[in-house]
Amino acid sequence: MTGRSYEVRTFGCQMNVHDSERLSGLLESAGYVPAPPGSEADVVVFNTCAVRENADNRLYGNLGQLVPVKKGHPGMQIAVGGCLAQKDRSTILDRAPWVDVVFGTHNLHRLPVLLERARHNAAAELEIAEALEVFPSSLPTRRASHHSAWVSISVGCDNTCTFCIVPSLRGRERDRRPGDVLAEVEALVGEGALEITLLGQNVNSYGRSLGDPGAFAKLLLACGRVDGLERVRFTSPHPRDFTDDVIEAMAATPNVCHQLHMPLQSGSDDVLRRMRRSYRRDRFLGIVERVRAAMPDAAITTDIIVGFPGETEADFADTLDVVRQARFAGAFTFQYSPRPGTPAATMDGQIDRTTVAERYARLVALQDEVSWAQNRELVGRRVELLVAEGEGRKDDATGRLSGRARDGRLVHFRAGAGLAARPGDVVETVVTRAAPHHLTADGPLLSHRRTRAGDAWELARTAPVPAAGDGAGTTAARQTVALGMPSVGPAPSPGRR
């Protein structure tokens, strides 16, 4: 059956966002079309997270809201995949028997088949693979952005952090070969992408399974030789594996952005030991110091967990001290919550929620102070922005557009006269005001470069929305799908789109 509409709802990390692009690509390659905004999709797919607090409550709350919708929508199907599906398996069908398909992290490619089988048999399909069956980068992908793209360099994780369930759900780390990664990068740039983010659970352990511990630095240098690629980012590195050759490659490669997201998790050596993080605060601060020595303008962000079991007030004070010393541009901060199946969930010294919330508030207040101080130093500075879509929640009300500076900071700016800047275009402007989490530029644009990515965004916006069951619409929708990673041959030229 083709021509049915679909919607993918994503919870969790960048890995899930990229996996959802693949799920969309698989569905469109099988003949499904994106559901128009505001409509009820024939197929709703949940790509779930098992790391965030209350991840299961969020899923089952959303599933519960679909019960009356499904009753009034004959033939509607609901699928649940991702990390929570890999973990909970049949529990999902026990708690939500109206779900039609449950699939895991290792068998994304099976979704269209499972949906059709469930429809044909009028019975739920549960299929969880224990190991990766098909490397995800070979799957069709419907990119969410014309100008910026994720490129996976590895899947899985070999670390054993006591708070994290990801390795048991994503499997052991497996690296793609550098030539395959670069082929995908070149193909994306050939299609108009300006920015690539290299993605992995631990990007700077890349190459270990290939017998080349310096492979990640070499990959950054190779990305610097890709014509037309303007920005390269990566996420996330592990401080244990962060080596000086990566810093040297970042500093020496013009299109590698001076931005580093490196998870701290805690500033206390005792807590880091219980977390099994394999580094200590002095090593972390040493990396920060060397990065800033090589790239004084680098924006460094981090992840921090508050209230890990056994964390004392002195441990928490150590974390605040590292925040002051490291001067993070921003931080993703989390209140620890026990995740079933992790060693930390059964550790002694679980901290009461009131104490955790109080420490969390102090951490956020300090980080906002640090971020705001850094951002105020940028007022009056000229910045180059890659115009984004959906980054500014108040853009419509304020008459502004939003974009990302090369260091990753979010900047809201005035659109200016003449041809409007579009997502994917590149503009230059001057920062006029600072806030803890963004910058504002209310002056005139100093330059505006229209790009092929902006052209593609404009074309997609003006194209008619395909209707479910409309064969022509289905074909139009499928033109946005890249059919996997090219194995050989050059990237397509701009004229061969």
Swiss-Prot record:
It is an enzyme of class 2 (transferase). Residues 376-445 form the TRAM domain. Residues 143-374 form the Radical SAM core domain. Binds 2 [4Fe-4S] clusters. One cluster is coordinated with 3 cysteines and an exchangeable S-adenosyl-L-methionine. It catalyses: N(6)-dimethylallyladenosine(37) in tRNA + (sulfur carrier)-SH + AH2 + 2 S-adenosyl-L-methionine = 2-methylsulfanyl-N(6)-dimethylallyladenosine(37) in tRNA + (sulfur carrier)-H + 5'-deoxyadenosine + L-methionine + A + S-adenosyl-L-homocysteine + 2 H(+). [4Fe-4S] cluster 1 binds at C13, C49, C83. Its cofactor is [4Fe-4S] cluster. Keywords: 4Fe-4S, Cytoplasm, Iron, Iron-sulfur, Metal-binding, S-adenosyl-L-methionine, Transferase, tRNA processing. Coiled coil: none annotated. [4Fe-4S] cluster 2 binds at C157, C161, C164. It comes from the Bacteria. The keyword Nucleotidyltransferase does not apply. GO terms for molecular function: 4 iron, 4 sulfur cluster binding; metal ion binding; N6-isopentenyladenosine methylthiotransferase activity. Residues 4-120 form the MTTase N-terminal domain. GO terms for cellular component: cytosol. Transmembrane segments: none annotated. Its EC number is 2.8.4.3. Belongs to the methylthiotransferase family. MiaB subfamily. HAMAP family: tRNA_metthiotr_MiaB (MF_01864). Monomer. Catalyzes the methylthiolation of N6-(dimethylallyl)adenosine (i(6)A), leading to the formation of 2-methylthio-N6-(dimethylallyl)adenosine (ms(2)i(6)A) at position 37 in tRNAs that read codons beginning with uridine. This is tRNA-2-methylthio-N(6)-dimethylallyladenosine synthase. It comes from Frankia alni (strain DSM 45986 / CECT 9034 / ACN14a). The gene is miaB.
